[in-house]
Structures are given as C-alpha cells and as structure tokens.
Amino acid sequence: MAIVVVGMLDEREEALTIILDRIRQRGHRTCLIDISVGAGAIVPALQPDVTCQELAELAKERAGLAVGQGVTPNSVVTEGLKAKIHDLYGCGQLEGMVAITGMTGALISLPAMKELPFGVPKLLISGATGQPVHAAKFGDYFARRDITVMHTVVDTVGMNPLVRSLALNGADAISGMVEHYSHGNVAMGCQQDASAVGRLSSHCAYRISHRLECFGVSHNERNGIHFGDCNRHGTGGCRDK
C-alpha cells in the first residue's frame, strides 16, 4: 500500500519532492500523481508514477471525456483522478491521500478525496480554501466528508523556508494519520440497520442518546450532514468508535 501524493509538477515540483522524501523517510511507500493542466511555468525533472496524460486517458475511457467542444483540461483531469483514486483504493493500494495545491488543484483533488470512505486519511494542503470569497465552492466537500485541510496562508509555488516548513508538516501529518489509522477503529464496510432521530433540542437529544446507550445502541449526532453520503461507501452510518 502507498500514500498517494497529488499535485501539479509544473508548478509545485519542489514542495512535492520534499513531501515525497519525508513520507519515505518515515517508512511509507508513495505514489505520485501529476495533475498538471499546462498552466505551470516550469519543466519538471521529477517523474510521476501516474502522469496527467494517463489521467486524461482514464477520463476518456470511463466517462467519455476529452478536451474540446466545451470540455476543459481541468474537467478531464478531475474525472481521471477520481477514476484513478477509485481504482487504487479498490485494489487495496491506497492507505492515504495528500494534495498540495492552489485553487485549481484543490478543485481537481477534492472530488477524488470525496470518493474515499469515511476514516481513510485525506489531507489538502492549500491556501485557496481560506479565502471567504471561495467558501461556497468548498462547502459540498467539507460539510460531507472528513477531509483535513492545512491552510498554508502563503502560496506554495517555489521554495523558501515557509513553503519547506509547510511541506514537511504536511508530510508528517498524513504519515501520522496513516500510521494511527486502523480499519478496526472505524466502522468500514459494516452495514447495519439503524433508526434516524430528528430533533430540535440538544437537551432532548442528550436524553435520547443516553437511553439508546443503555440499550447498547451506538449513535452519532450530525448537524445537516447527509448520512446517505457516508453509507454510500459502506461506512455503517458513520458510527462512533
């Protein structure tokens, strides 16, 4: 199994190199996926395990998408990345996913992260998500998925002490999440019948939850979260541990 590292090599090769090296130093295998769409200014020397061309081929094969006639490179790479992440996880080759991006890369990476089940470590390192003007673009991902975000404050293109620190912290974060993640600690693939309880009062909810616990029923409270999104991947209704 490997930690999947995602980013645009023609923009963030240096930061990606640091992340890869640090993850490997901690004893994990890596799988680098390039999501470049031709907007970067450098010609990278680092070779990815999965190229953006391979993602484009996957998008065409699985979804019939190809650049042209209103279909953008961003859409093609997004669809290809979703398919690749789905395949890697389905084959038992993915144990975590980290992406270091700007705005475009975040919007390409998040749909793939959203496809991963509850509990699987997923980390987005980006400064784009902290901008209030863009909040609506990310609501569907963060409200319904356990995606961890490291807000970078500064851009991560190029290299300086700040970017280096962010890359190292991000690599240590995803490594630590993977090291302590256990399928036995999360109700993965354990479908159970359950009752849904709607409520308006916290006091009432606490009383009901206490009574349920007396009967040995595991429960969870959520504010406006669609449980169907969690159950869709066999997470047993996102039950507590």
Task: Place the predicted regions along the sequence by residue.
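Short coil/turn connectors at secondary-structure junctions
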Residues: 1-2, 26-29, 91-96, 117-122, ...
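Glycine-rich phosphate/diphosphate-binding loop of Rossmann-like nucleotide-binding domains
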Residues: 12-24, 31-32, 37-50, 172-238
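Segments that form or flank anion-binding pockets
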Residues: 22, 32, 37, 45-52, ...
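Short, acidic/small-residue loops that bind anionic groups at enzyme active sites
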Residues: 108-138, 148-151, 203-206, 224-228
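Short glycine-rich or small-residue beta-strand-to-loop segments that form or flank ligand, phosphate
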Residues: 2-8, 65-72, 89, 93-101, ...
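Cap/lid and interdomain-hinge subdomains that line or gate substrate/regulatory clefts
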Residues: 65, 69, 133-199
